[in-house]
């Protein structure tokens, strides 16, 4: 058996990072961590605490309350997948709402939020054998990761994928244009923020999955993993 490694999968929102990271982790017996879910959980906390007034976040109150935000992952025995818990409550479905999607990028630009999340993520990866997806895993969280993937896809393809997810969860009101606008705005914020902006690591392999099926993506990732580990 080869020594365990760290696999960093970065890329734009709604490009299928989480799906491929979960599939890869399950196939190779690694732990999967959805870092985007961590930022979404902080966002959900801020919404529930009423920290948004007329679209503006009370950042100082959130800063002071960050020590009260406890995010953990627990394995769902039925699905075999990790689910997100906020202060002991399963919020896996709640963090996927459009309201959270609309506010998560501004939350993720806050230095004190990113610093707290990065510390947690680095602690999770100390023993390696982990697949972590996000925006800055290969550049900030684990710049020494042995395998780095940068995922992208056309905006309209990503919007349709996200809309399909929302429809499957019972959202019948959000439109394609709503989702596309949200994705384009998140791209802008993620790419221009001062702290850990979304960018491709110099040594990352690029995967444009605009026209790939999930099985094709999984096969591609497994091939790259075998190349890196020599397995």
Curated annotation (Swiss-Prot):
Record's keyword annotation contains Protein transport: no
What keyword terms does UniProt attach to this protein? Answer: ATP-binding, Cytoplasm, Kinase, Nucleotide-binding, Transferase
Q: Where does ATP bind?
A: 11-19
Q: Which CDD domains match?
A: CMPK (cd02020)
Instruction: Give the chief site where it resides.
Output: cytoplasm
**The keyword Nucleotide-binding belongs to this UniProt entry's keyword annotation:** yes
Q: Name one Pfam family in it.
A: Cytidylate_kin
**Subcellular location per the Swiss-Prot or TrEMBL entry:** Cytoplasm
GO terms for MF: ATP binding; CMP kinase activity; dCMP kinase activity
GO BP annotations, alphabetical order? nucleobase-containing small molecule interconversion; pyrimidine nucleotide metabolic process
Give the Enzyme Commission number.
2.7.4.25
Q: Which residue ranges does UniProt annotate as crossing the membrane?
A: none
**Which cellular component terms (GO) are annotated to the entry?**
cytosol
Q: Which reaction does it catalyse?
A: CMP + ATP = CDP + ADP; dCMP + ATP = dCDP + ADP
Q: Which HAMAP family has this protein been placed in?
A: Cytidyl_kinase_type1 (MF_00238)
Q: Which family does it belong to?
A: Belongs to the cytidylate kinase family. Type 1 subfamily.
Its protein name is Cytidylate kinase
* Originating organism: Porphyromonas gingivalis (strain ATCC BAA-308 / W83)
């Amino acid at each position: 058996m080869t020594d365990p490694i760290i696999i960093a999968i970065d890329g734009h929102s709604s490009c299928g990072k989480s799906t491929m990271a979960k599939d890869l982790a399950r196939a190779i017996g690694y732990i999967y961590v959805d870092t985007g879910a961590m930022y979404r959980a902080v966002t959900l906390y801020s919404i529930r605490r009423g920290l948004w007034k007329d679209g503006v976040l009370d950042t100082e109150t959130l800063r002071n309350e960050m020590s009260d935000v406890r995010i953990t992952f627990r394995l769902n025995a039925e699905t075999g997948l990790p689910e997100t818990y906020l202060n002991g409550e399963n919020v896996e479905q709640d963090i996927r709402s459009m309201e959270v999607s609309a506010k998560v990028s501004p939350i993720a630009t806050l230095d004190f939020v990113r610093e707290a999340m990065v510390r947690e993520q680095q602690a999770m990866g100390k023993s390696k054998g982990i697949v972590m997806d996000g925006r800055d895993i290969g550049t900030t969280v684990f710049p020494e990761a042995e395998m780095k993937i940068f995922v992208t896809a056309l905006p309209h393809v990503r919007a349709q994928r996200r809309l399909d997810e929302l429809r499957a969860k019972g959202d019948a009101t959000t439109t394609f244009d709503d989702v596309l606008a949200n994705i384009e705005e998140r791209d802008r914020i993620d790419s221009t923020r001062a702290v850990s902006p979304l960018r491709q690591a110099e040594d990352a392999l690029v995967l444009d999955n605009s026209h790939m099926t999930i099985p094709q993506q999984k096969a591609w990732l497994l091939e790259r993993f075998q190349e890196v580990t020599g397995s």
